[in-house]
Every structure is written in structure tokens, then in C-alpha cells.
């Protein structure tokens, strides 16, 4: 088996793109980098590190082929002028002294994770670095700051940012007496809490915010983080402090972000909008992404799409990350859970967001307490490898800030500009996530159109965190495009499971319309439409 591992999770324009080739490579094997299916660079390779040179900004699929053009292995790379414009988010949770970090580095490189959340690295929630060099965290997990620093160094070596976890308003029992005057209280006068061990204060209380900002600054100085994942628990929305002061918690969160940014002007900050609260207020605050952790009532694929779409509207170009924990792996076989994860990724990627899911060496998130994670089975690891490669390779068609949805303006019988049918099976095509149908979405990316076809045929519902059936075969699709001139359009398709690289399909002309026969979709098919071959030959 041959494995391709980029040396970086993301490359800058002045960095050569280097690919480590692991395994026995046949003589004459060639490594090729393609941008949207078009060859940009290639080189002959053997064992070791292959140099594809410097590449222009963009996403690239990278294939290793033998002399007969058979594909031996694939990966992807992205070149970006601004690393903070991209966030493919991962996590680590294990800080035991002396642990081997090699497999963690491999996973970051394989899945192209550009940011890593250091979950529960701190001594206490209200005293981040007060435990010395070796301690147990608030829930008894062992932490060595030497291991934390080694993980940070590892992130830097592969081009990822290391973000320390910090809850913006949580205080443990040991520190509570010092801070209970800032408590946020229920109507009955009890302090809001998480379980029975963390109590909630007003994050914008003057003395608390001074303490919190000093604590994160000390953590940067002593440990070396590139920034922070600023957490909250989604409640309360409004409350009173112990002194009777009414608190609009959304405003307090914005104040907190502003104060942390003032204290750490060069750091990368990501705030958690739990269940979309308060994205409308926090998205414009001085942070580097819009991050949302979803819970009921966001239970369906369409709910994920709605959350991602609203977030992109508020984000003003910042990357959007959705934390959607796939609890399904705890209760279902890997095969049906993998399909649930694939449909979650298809929904989020096609709506311009990424998913916080993967981390450590081989783990995925199935619980909000990240220490309770799930070890991936081989099928899951292979799925994630394929789909994360696909995300990176087609980034400018998926997550670029300027992408606009045009489904309602182009599809359907009234518009009749771009649409698809499945004549062999009569499978319905819809504007929303509907069981038994193809979910069709059309976006405009520059002067191109992108059609996303998510196959929900064979599903009895559209829950994103439930076991999924094998997708039903719907047959080939007939794509219909209203022509914009005498030049025929160019149509290409890609599928993360069946043909990850964009390939051309034949286009025929009939009066004012062009038609193309699309391969049968599996779970998600991306169709790239160039209205004129003269523009994109």
C-alpha cells in the first residue's frame, strides 16, 4: 500500500509543495497535481519526498499513477495567501507525559487540518496555568505541559494553528467563593451551572474579564498557544447578577471577545455559538471564524444547511465551522454511521461550511466532552480521507466567501435555466432535504455554476445523526442548461466516493438548451458548469 502525505496542512504561495511518498513506488511512477481537474504540475517519484514546486493559490488534487496511468494513491493540497481565511478544525485531548505524537502529525497532514483545539488542557477553568508543569485537570485527566508544548510545536511544523480551550464564564468549586459575586442567577436565585462542578459568571463583569484576559495572556506566554477556542454552554440568554444587575449575555459575549482581542491582537480566536446563540451578535466581533455547535432542534440535514447558510450570511468572509457530533457511532454499525457522517459532510460542504469532527491520531467526536471520543474503524478512516481530500481539492467551489446560492432563481419549471431529472427511475428532485428524493442546490462561484446533488433516495427520514440506509440507485441524470450564446457550456462532475477528480461529460445542443448525461450519483455529486467553453476551455 502506498500513502501520500503532504508535509503541510496548508501551503503559502512561496512554499514548495512537498508530498511524502510512503510505500513501494514502481519505477516510472508520476505524481500529478491538478487544479479543478486541469494538470498544473507533475514529477517522477520514488520513495521519500516529492517536490511539486510552488503552485498558485488554489486547491489541488494530487494523484500518484503508475506508467500505465493506474491511480496508486491520492491526496490533496491547498495553497492560500491568508492562512486565517481557512479553518479545517480538529482536536487533541491526550496530554499524558511522554506520549508518542507521530500518528497525530500524520492525521493532521492526511486530513489537512489547519486548526487544532486543545480541549481541556488547562489546570482549572478559572485558573488556566496554576497547576505547575504536571497536573490533573478538573475531571482528573493527566496533563503534562511538556506534552502540550510538543503538540503545539507539532502543529507549527505541519502548518496548523494551536488553539487552547478556555470557557469564558466557568468557575469550579475551588474558586467559586472568589467569584460568586459575579454569578448569573436563575429566577429562583440559584447560580446557573454546568452539572454540579462548574458555575457561570457574567463573562463581561469587570473584575472577571480582567482576570480572564490576564489568564489567557499568561497561557500564551508560558505554553505558546496561537490563540484560543472560547467556549460557552448556550445558556443563560438573559439573567441577573448576584447584585441584581440585568445581563444580556449575548452582549457580554461580544464584550468578552473584544477584550480578549485587545489583549491578544495577533492571536487566532474562535468563539463557540452554541445552538446558533448568539451568532447574530458575535459573528461581527473581532474573531477569526464563525463556529456553531448544534443541538436539538437542529436535528435534520436541512437544519444543518440553514445554520450554515445563516452563518455565512453573518460571517462577512470568515470561515464557517459547524460542530456536529456524530453520536450515531455509539449505537450503530460503522457502515450505516459512515453514511450518516457522509450526508452531514455533503450538506455542510455544499453549503459552504466545514465540520469539526476529527482529531488525535484516529478519533472522531461523538460527545461534547471530547475525551469521550470514538476510535475510527478502517471504513470510517478511508471515508474521511476521501472526503477531506475532496473538500480541499474543490475548496473554491465550496467554501469561498463569494459563493452565492441561486437555486430558486435558476431551477424549476418557471425558471427553466438549470435543472436535472432522473428519467430511468423517476426519482424526484427537490429544493429541500426530502426523504426518497435528490436534494438539488445550485450556487454561483465567480462566472461558473455549481450544482450539488445529495442522494436521499432510500432514506426514510433526513436526520443527520441517525443510521442511514444504503442509497438507492437512481440511474443517470439528464442535465438541462439554457444556453447563453453560441458556445456550448462545459460540464464536469466529481464525486468523493466514485470519481473524486472533475471529469468532462459530453454535452449535446438542442435549440436554446444544452443537455448532458450525468453519471448516477452515490451520496453526493458535484456538477461544475462553465456557461461557455470560451471562458473556461
Model-assigned labels for residue ranges:
Residues 72-124:
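An acidic-aromatic substrate-binding cleft motif
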Residues 83, 93-98, 164-223:
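Active-site-adjacent "subsite" loops/lids of carbohydrate-active enzymes
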Residues 86-99, 129-145, 194-210, 234, ...:
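The substrate-binding groove and active-site-proximal loops of carbohydrate-active enzymes
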Residues 122-171, 244-253:
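Aromatic-lined substrate-binding rim segments of carbohydrate-active enzymes
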Residues 204-290, 295-306, 315:
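Active-site neighborhood of glycoside hydrolase catalytic domains
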Residues 232, 318-413:
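Aromatic/acidic polysaccharide-binding cleft in carbohydrate-active enzymes
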Residues 422-485, 525:
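Carbohydrate-binding surface patches
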Residues 509-537:
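C-terminal beta-strand-rich structural cap/linker in extracellular carbohydrate-active enzymes
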Amino acid at each position: 500500500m502506498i500513502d501520500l502525505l503532504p508535509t503541510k496542512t496548508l501551503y503559502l504561495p512561496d512554499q514548495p509543495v512537498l508530498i511524502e511518498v510512503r510505500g513501494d513506488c514502481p519505477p516510472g511512477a508520476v505524481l500529478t497535481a491538478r487544479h479543478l481537474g486541469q494538470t498544473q504540475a507533475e514529477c517522477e517519484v520514488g520513495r521519500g519526498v516529492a517536490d511539486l514546486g510552488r503552485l498558485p493559490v488554489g486547491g489541488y488534487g494530487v494523484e500518484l499513477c503508475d506508467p500505465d496511468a493506474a491511480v496508486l494513491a491520492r491526496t490533496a493540497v491547498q495553497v492560500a495567501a491568508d492562512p486565517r481565511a481557512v479553518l479545517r478544525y480538529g482536536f487533541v485531548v491526550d496530554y499524558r507525559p511522554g506520549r508518542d505524537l507521530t500518528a497525530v502529525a500524520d492525521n493532521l497532514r492526511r486530513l489537512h487540518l489547519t486548526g487544532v483545539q486543545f480541549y481541556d488542557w488547562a489546570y482549572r477553568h478559572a485558573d488556566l496555568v496554576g497547576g505547575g508543569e504536571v497536573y490533573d485537570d478538573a475531571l482528573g485527566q493527566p496533563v503534562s505541559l511538556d506534552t502540550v508544548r510538543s503538540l503545539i510545536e507539532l502543529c507549527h511544523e505541519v502548518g496548523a494553528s494551536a488553539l487552547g480551550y478556555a470557557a469564558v464564564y466557568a468557575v469550579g468549586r475551588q474558586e467559586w467563593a472568589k467569584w460568586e459575586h459575579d454569578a448569573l442567577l436563575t429566577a429562583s436565585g440559584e447560580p446557573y451551572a454546568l452539572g454540579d462542578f462548574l458555575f457561570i459568571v457574567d463573562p463581561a463583569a469587570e473584575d472577571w474579564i480582567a482576570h480572564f484576559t490576564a489568564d489567557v495572556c499568561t497561557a500564551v506566554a508560558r505554553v505558546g498557544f496561537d490563540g484560543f477556542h472560547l467556549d460557552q454552554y448556550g445558556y443563560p440568554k438573559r439573567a441577573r447578577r448576584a447584585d441584581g444587575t440585568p445581563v444580556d449575555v449575548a452582549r457580554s459575549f461580544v464584550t468578552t471577545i473584544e477584550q480578549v482581542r485587545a489583549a491578544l491582537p495577533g492571536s487566532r480566536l474562535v468563539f463557540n455559538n452554541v445552538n446558533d446563540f448568539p451568532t447574530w451578535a458575535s459573528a461581527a466581533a473581532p474573531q477569526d471564524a464563525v463556529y456553531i455547535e448544534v443541538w436539538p432542534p437542529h436535528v435534520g440535514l436541512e437544519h444543518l444547511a440553514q445554520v450554515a447558510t445563516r452563518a455565512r450570511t453573518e460571517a462577512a468572509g470568515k470561515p464557517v465551522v459547524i460542530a456536529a457530533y456524530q453520536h450515531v457511532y455509539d449505537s450503530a454499525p460503522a457502515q450505516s454511521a459512515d453514511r450518516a457522517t457522509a450526508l452531514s459532510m455533503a450538506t455542510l460542504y455544499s453549503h459552504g461550511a466545514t465540520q469539526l469532527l476529527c482529531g488525535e491520531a484516529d478519533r472522531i467526536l461523538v460527545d461534547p466532552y471530547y475525551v469521550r471520543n470514538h476510535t475510527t474503524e478502517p471504513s470510517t478512516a478511508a471515508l474521511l480521507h476521501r472526503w477531506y481530500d475532496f473538500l480541499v481539492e474543490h475548496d473554491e467551489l465550496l467554501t469561498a466567501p463569494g459563493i452565492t446560492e441561486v437555486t430558486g432563481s435558476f431551477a424549476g419549471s418557471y425558471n427553466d435555466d438549470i435543472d436535472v431529472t432522473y428519467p430511468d427511475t423517476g426519482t424526484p428532485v427537490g429544493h429541500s432535504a426530502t426523504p426518497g428524493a435528490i436534494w438539488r442546490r445550485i450556487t454561483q462561484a465567480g462566472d461558473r455554476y455549481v450544482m450539488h446533488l445529495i442522494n436521499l433516495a432510500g432514506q426514510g427520514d433526513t436526520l443527520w445523526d441517525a443510521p442511514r440506509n444504503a442509497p438507492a440507485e437512481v440511474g443517470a441524470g439528464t442535465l438541462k442548461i439554457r444556453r447563453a450564446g453560441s458556445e456550448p457550456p462545459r460540464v464536469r462532475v466529481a464525486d468523493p466516493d466514485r470519481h473524486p477528480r472533475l471529469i468532462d461529460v459530453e454535452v449535446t445542443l438542442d435549440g436554446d438548451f444544452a443537455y448532458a448525461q450525468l453519471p448516477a450519483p452515490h451520496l453526493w455529486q458535484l456538477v461544475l458548469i462553465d456557461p461557455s467553453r470560451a471562458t473556461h476551455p
